[in-house]
């Protein structure tokens, strides 16, 4: 992380991986304002498993987009790993998305590059992040999810379940 990003740390959030305080998201068009999220308070402790469930239009995707750095809150406080996302610059968001969070779309086809092999798909984010020993790390990850034998397979040679495991 950059020195700039390290200075955007909330003092009392060491206990929490995610903390939302009175979080608000308003989408605006020329004529209409839609309140997608209003006054959300949420604490997720480190190591805690959390499921976000709710009716259609209840703000689940809005919250996840903000946690994933794909959208910015309109008001309130949002901390991830002790960092205050409301103070992020565009550069901070880029670094955050590369090093802190991952976002997996429901449609796996959007998460993978079809003409690359399984191992190349795993290596791609590491390449963009400048990591060394990418091939070794990619092979270890494929082994962990039981896909080492499919390392040289392209997506059209793999099942839907294998796509999910690969993502």
Language model features: what each stretch is:
Residues 13-20, 26-39:
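A short, flexible loop at the N-terminus of ABC-type nucleotide-binding domains that lies
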Residues 19, 83-84, 131-150:
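Conserved ABC ATPase "signature" region
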Residues 31-32, 85-102, 128:
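ABC ATPase NBD coupling module
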Residues 53-55:
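The feature captures the beta-strand-to-loop junction immediately N-terminal to the Walker
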Residues 68:
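Helix-to-loop junction immediately C-terminal to a conserved catalytic motif
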Residues 76-84:
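Conserved ABC transporter NBD signature motif
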Residues 114-123:
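Short coil-to-helix segment of the ABC ATPase nucleotide-binding domain corresponding to the Q-loop/switch region
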Residues 154-164:
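Conserved ABC ATPase signature
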């Amino acid at each position: 992380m950059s020195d700039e990003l390290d200075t955007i740390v909330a003092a009392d959030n060491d206990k929490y991986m995610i903390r939302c305080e009175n979080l608000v998201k308003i989408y605006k068009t020329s004529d209409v304002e839609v309140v997608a999220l209003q006054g959300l308070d949420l604490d997720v402790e480190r190591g805690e498993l959390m499921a976000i469930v709710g009716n259609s239009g209840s703000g689940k995707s809005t919250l996840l987009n903000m946690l994933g750095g794909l959208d910015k809150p309109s008001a309130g406080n949002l901390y991830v790993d002790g960092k205050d996302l409301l103070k992020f610059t565009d550069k901070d968001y880029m670094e955050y998305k590369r090093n802190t969070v991952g976002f997996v779309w429901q449609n796996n086809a959007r998460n993978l590059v079809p003409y690359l092999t399984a191992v190349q798909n795993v290596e791609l984010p590491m390449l963009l992040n400048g990591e060394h020993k990418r091939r070794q790390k990619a092979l270890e990850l494929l082994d962990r999810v039981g896909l080492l034998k499919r390392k040289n397979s392209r997506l059209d040679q793999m099942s839907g379940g294998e796509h999910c495991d690969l993502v």
